[in-house]
A protein has these predicted regions:
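HAD-like aspartate-dependent phosphatase fold
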Residues: 1-27, 31-218
């Protein structure tokens, strides 16, 4: 029998929920950990739908494209579409379009999945070539990171190319027995080599992350 979720919400909570139109829900470490869905997630989302509250999934992890995240959510039993997703890749794309409108070619220190998200948005990815000068350098959580590309990113940072970090996290949450070195730690490496920090670091808690959701659902 299908549960009537409205009956599980107290009157006091209903009153508070009535003032909420849309929620921004973190993903990594909040609705799931690695590949493990938390036991309360499905029921919580059902309660929000029953209360007429919309929600978006947001994540500081740019290593997957929106399509990849939707596939992961589907595998965990969560229904979602592109309108429900906002990643730090999308935040970086929105930021570049707003602040560097003429930028077309980017040096992207990120996974192939992330690069595909930028290419889908109309950008081109620069080669690892000192003559292929980027309009903007983007450093991200790159699980495919290799030494040559780290050196090239450091070179462009040292040359004054506009420099954006997708998120501040030092490590990415995981249920595996390892430490996933994240964007913040990669940027510290570049800083140690060049003395330069990113011009802006997006992702939570930067307000640009919520601005993207407000622009879509506000």
């Amino acid at each position: 029998m299908k549960q009537n979720h409205n009956q599980t919400i107290s009157p006091e909570l209903k009153e508070k929920l009535a003032r909420i139109r849309h929620l921004a829900l973190d993903m990594d470490g909040t609705i799931y950990m690695g590949s493990t869905l938390f036991p309360f997630t499905i029921d919580f989302l059902a309660e929000m739908r029953a209360a007429g509250i919309g929600y978006s999934f947001l994540t500081n992890n740019p290593s997957r494209s929106v399509a990849d995240y939707l596939k992961k959510l589907e595998g965990l039993g969560i229904e979602a579409d592109e309108e429900n997703m906002y990643t730090t890749s999308l935040a970086a794309i929105d930021y570049i379009k707003a602040h560097y409108p003429s930028a077309r070619r980017l040096f992207l220190l990120g996974t192939p999945s992330m690069v595909s998200q930028f290419e889908k948005a109309g950008f081109e990815s620069c080669a690892d070539d000192p003559d292929d000068v980027p309009d903007v350098l983007v450093a991200a959580f790159d699980m495919t990171l290799d030494y040559q590309r780290l050196c090239r990113a450091s070179w462009w940072a040292s040359q004054g190319v506009p420099y954006i970090a997708t998120n501040p996290d030092r490590v990415c949450p995981t249920d595996q027995r390892t430490v996933l070195v994240d964007c913040g730690s990669i940027c510290r490496c570049i800083e140690h080599a060049t003395g330069r920090r990113p011009d802006i670091t997006l992702g939570k808690p930067d307000p640009n992350m919520l601005k993207g959701i407000l622009d879509r659902h506000g």
